[in-house]
Swiss-Prot record:
Protein name (Swiss-Prot/TrEMBL): Probable protein phosphatase 2C 66
Cofactor remark: Binds 2 magnesium or manganese ions per subunit.
Binding sites annotated in the UniProt record for Mn(2+) 1: 282-283
Binding site for Mn(2+) 2: 282, 593, 656
Organism name: Arabidopsis thaliana (Mouse-ear cress)
Swiss-Prot/TrEMBL domain comment: The conserved PP2C phosphatase domain (244-663) is interrupted by an insertion of approximately 100 amino acids.
Family recorded in the similarity comment: Belongs to the PP2C family.
Region Disordered: start-end pairs: 153-175, 202-247, 373-392
Amino acid sequence: MGNGVTTLTGCCTGTLAGEISRRYDVSLVHDGLGHSFCYIRPDLPGVVLPSPESPLRSDHIQETTFRSISGASVSANPSTALSGALSSDSDCPYSSAVSASAFESSGNFASLPLQPVPRGSTWQSGPIVNESGLGSAPFERRFLSGPIESGLYSGPIESTKKTEKEKPKKIRKKPKSKKNFLTFKTLFANLISNNNKPRLKKSVIEPINGSDSSDSGRLHHEPVITSSRSNENPKSDLEEEDEKQSMNSVLDVQWAQGKAGEDRVHVVVSEDNGWVFVGIYDGFSGPDAPDYLLNNLYTAVQKELNGLLWNDEKLRSLGENGMTKTGKCSDEEDPESGKENCPVINNDDAVASGARNQAKSLKWRCEWEKKSNNKTKSDNRCDQKGSNSTTTNHKDVLKALLQALRKTEDAYLELADQMVKENPELALMGSCVLVTLMKGEDVYVMNVGDSRAVLGRKPNLATGRKRQKELERIREDSSLEDKEILMNGAMRNTLVPLQLNMEHSTRIEEEVRRIKKEHPDDDCAVENDRVKGYLKVTRAFGAGFLKQPKWNDALLEMFRIDYIGTSPYITCSPSLCHHKLTSRDKFLILSSDGLYEYFSNQEAIFEVESFISAFPEGDPAQHLIQEVLLRAANKFGMDFHELLEIPQGDRRRYHDDVSVIVISLEGRIWRSSM
């Protein structure tokens, strides 16, 4: 997201692309550019995945529909040192990483540094055009690590040497290779052959060092840090590795954490319980807020949800049971599945009625139309069998997410308040939050800020008014020049977007009206399309100087705003949504706002659908990032390589940090960040 104060005025005026690239040492700028990682969920006995033609619901299936995770990370902002107030070097897994991009994970994830294809190299496999004619441009490979063949997702990759601890039944058989993807396969094979050690589920990238976290409540074991910059050998032995894997086995999760500039991404997968957690934290004005979210929000969510979506006795000691009272949540019905969709609701709709001191927030309706109730009440079931055959109240799950976020921000502000005199910059730091929890066919989304969760689904092109509404949805985010082709695509059953969360930014008139209504005495509450002339987002985690006068007073005079009254200008009140998946839903794109500097919702869905059609085994998330870079380069008169030759920091003038996760609802997940 970057610092909201910075303004761009003629940064490229009169500058030739070649002159830009010649100012930098090309041999250094790709060092720490980003990383790729991959994960495949082991085959579990008795699991039957639904076919694309059949509805996702099945009473005997308790497993999620995701299958694998892959992606990449590229940063636009440089690495910024933590203030030192919220975490010491030993607490922060990224404190030792000089690079703007870093990655750490449990052993079942594998990662590689991300490198662009050299200029004029034969490594490039394109242009390759989709036979259907879809897509804005021919698909060309710009990175050495993608598209990725599905057989390379599993980690560790099959080896001739096996330890007694390995479980062959959990290792997926590799399909036959395709020549277009041999590059990535070769890179992985070389790494495995050079680092073939008898360690169970060892990451193919050797760690730089371990993070000796002092937080006893942290869920994860000591992390394996993978930086794109360093080639140092780690300090680890078999006993330490066995200890880590033993702890990971007890906690029964696989996890990955990545950073790209000021973006942070957190993925947690429970292989046995069948759920996936994804957090995207788009920071601004510094790294402390997104780092704090990365280290604490998932743990808070896990504590609040224990007893709702799962009831693991091994984890119960980590926190209290998060059961809460039923909140207000108007229900919608999907005519196709007969199951409830809980629309986007706001924080204050879910809290107990006794919380009178909370600022009154605007109530809004879902941005998609309300659907009529065509099913009998026997089919309209809000509850679903959980992992322990206990009913799940979706409203309570959403409330648990909200409580976890509230407690995390309260702890962050309390800790920062103790250090604000020594570190006044903490009052400026904040982050957007996008959290998605997926279990089976239930998807829960919590959002604060301008990140988006966009579902790609087949339109239900019925007759009459409903057909017209489906077609109107296509026009929603499309530019004028794209409307004709997109509408024609809809007539051919091209996927259409469904945004599951409300965006909290000054682009949304409801948000602007709310802030002005809460500050009638301040004519500059929203100025130059920014809250107090500073932030485009109208809700955020942290950013205390826009929430309380005391935080604003702690800043240096040059950074202070004219704070009028005592009411907060922004809040951390999230939008919450529960969506029940159906056979029409094909994939879900989770992204920070950087993606939508160059894409509309429809264009992003259209691009992913087109790419998957051309490369069923490819990485659509990395492809979206590549397209962002191509569009940014074209906008400023550069080519792909010239843009990447500009170092982080300077490159922020052309594009933002972008984090993208594409979850395929037909068996795969792809993840990328930039």
